[in-house]
Structure formats: structure tokens, C-alpha cells
């Protein structure tokens, strides 16, 4: 769990868990990013899957191409399709990680994170289907002549299973990024809400007026001057004889 938490720890202080836009590029730091490491594993697993199936998944039987997965051509085609598109998507998202740190627009980062989360979740499901499909067909198929291609078919099945884990981790990291960005948007929206600013100003103005009223003298200066004149006019004057 500690290793998983370390992998999913992606908050770098910028929008949607990325770094500050315009920062200096460090190749070593970029290569050690959890997103890049997991994408590289997805890329490697995809290469193994479609490489094994395309190289030794087909054989000729009675003048026709025969899929070693119980003769089911769709099984070989589906495994190739999932592997090829996973390979291309992994390279695309690794390039996206390079550009992600340079995206100054929060909306652009949000679109990228949502695309990453959606595609990673979809390809987790696609590899899950591929694992079940290929394993089911292989368990029902007869051993190939001289055992040629059997190792590659088993390897493709195992790496479909590994791909489920790697793509699921990509989806989890993208989901955590999305939560970080959603929390930042909520905080900034609350702080800049005009209604909140108006209420704060109104409360501050009321408090200032109350303090002024309590600190002010009950009688103004002109009234004090009038009282002094009345007192001076009412002073006793000694009569003259």
C-alpha cells in the first residue's frame, strides 16, 4: 500500500497535479514521473502482446491461415488490435505528459486529464476482455504441431493480464488528478464569488459604523459652544450705586 500511495502521489503544486507552467525541463525528473513510468510499461506490454500474436499466432492449414487460438481468427485479430492501439496510445500519452507541464491553460489540462482517464479506463476493460477471450480459446485449442507458437500464445495472455494492472493504474492516477483539479476550481470559485465579497464588505461597513457611533460624543462641538455662551450670559453682575 505504501508503494501504491507513493505512485499515486502526484500533486506537484500546479493545476491538476502538474508542475508550474513554464518551469525548466529536467529529463531525469520527467523519466521518473509515475505517469511516464507506468505509460512505458503499458507501451512495453502492448508491444509484447501484438508482437507475439502477429509473429506466431497464425499458421497455414489446408492452404488457409489458421489462428492458434482454437482456430478463431477473431481472437488473433482482437488481440492484435488491442495491442496496436495500446502501443500507439501509450506513446501519445507519454508525449502528452511532456506537454502537460507546459500547458498554461487550466481548461487544456482538464481536457487532457479527462481524455487520459476515459481512455485508460476503456483500455483496462479492453485488455480484461482480451485476457478472458484469449485464455478461453487457448484452453480449448489443440496443441500446435511440434509446439511451435505455444510459448508466444501463452506470453500474450500473461501480458494481457499485466496490461490490465498497468492501464488501471493510469486510470487511477488520472482520476486523482481530476479530483485535485476539481478541488482547486471549487476553492478558487468560492474565493472569487462576488456574493461572498459583498457580504464581507457589508459586515465590515456595519462594524465600522457601530464603532463610530459608540465612540462619538453624544453632543456635538457646536452644542458645547452654545452652552458656554449661555453660561457666560447668565453670570451675576454687581450693581453700581
Swiss-Prot record:
It is a multi-pass membrane protein. It comes from the Eukaryota. GO terms for cellular component: neuromuscular junction; synaptic vesicle membrane. It is found in: Cytoplasmic vesicle membrane; Cytoplasmic vesicle, Secretory vesicle membrane; Cytoplasmic vesicle, Secretory vesicle, Synaptic vesicle membrane. InterPro entries: Marvel, Synaptogyrin. One of its GO terms (biological process) is synaptic vesicle exocytosis. It holds the Pfam family MARVEL. Disruption phenotype: No obvious phenotype. Viable and fertile with normal basic motor functions. However in type 1b boutons at the larval neuromuscular junction of some mutants (30-40%), there is an increase in the number of synaptic vesicles with a large diameter and a decrease in vesicle density under resting conditions. Resolution of synaptic vesicles from endocytic cisternae following an intense stimulation is delayed, and consequently boutons display an increased number of cisternae. Keywords: Cytoplasmic vesicle, Endocytosis, Membrane, Synapse, Transmembrane, Transmembrane helix. This is Synaptogyrin. It comes from Drosophila melanogaster (Fruit fly).
Amino acid at each position: 500500500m505504501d508503494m501504491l500511495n507513493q505512485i499515486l502521489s502526484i500533486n506537484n503544486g500546479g493545476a491538476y497535479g502538474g508542475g508550474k507552467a513554464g518551469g525548466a525541463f529536467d529529463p531525469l525528473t520527467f523519466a521518473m514521473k509515475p505517469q511516464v513510468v507506468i505509460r512505458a510499461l503499458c507501451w512495453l506490454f502492448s508491444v509484447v502482446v501484438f508482437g507475439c500474436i502477429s509473429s506466431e499466432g497464425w499458421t497455414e492449414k489446408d492452404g488457409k491461415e489458421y489462428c492458434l487460438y482454437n482456430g478463431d481468427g477473431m481472437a488473433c485479430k482482437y488481440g492484435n488490435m488491442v495491442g496496436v492501439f495500446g502501443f500507439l496510445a501509450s506513446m501519445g500519452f507519454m508525449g502528452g505528459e511532456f506537454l502537460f507541464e507546459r500547458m498554461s491553460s487550466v481548461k487544456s489540462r482538464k481536457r487532457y486529464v479527462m481524455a487520459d482517464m476515459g481512455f485508460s479506463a476503456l483500455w483496462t476493460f479492453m485488455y480484461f476482455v482480451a485476457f478472458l477471450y484469449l485464455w478461453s480459446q487457448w484452453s480449448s485449442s489443440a496443441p500446435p504441431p511440434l509446439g511451435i507458437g505455444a510459448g508466444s500464445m501463452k506470453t500474450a495472455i500473461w501480458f494481457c493480464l499485466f496490461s490490465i494492472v498497468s492501464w488501471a493504474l493510469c486510470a487511477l492516477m488520472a482520476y486523482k488528478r481530476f479530483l485535485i483539479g476539481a478541488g482547486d476550481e471549487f476553492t478558487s470559485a468560492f474565493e472569487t464569488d462576488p456574493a461572498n465579497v459583498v457580504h464581507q464588505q457589508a459586515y465590515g461597513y456595519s462594524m465600522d459604523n457601530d464603532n463610530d457611533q459608540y465612540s462619538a460624543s453624544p453632543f456635538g462641538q457646536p452644542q458645547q459652544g452654545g452652552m458656554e455662551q449661555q453660561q457666560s450670559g447668565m453670570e451675576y453682575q454687581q450693581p453700581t450705586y
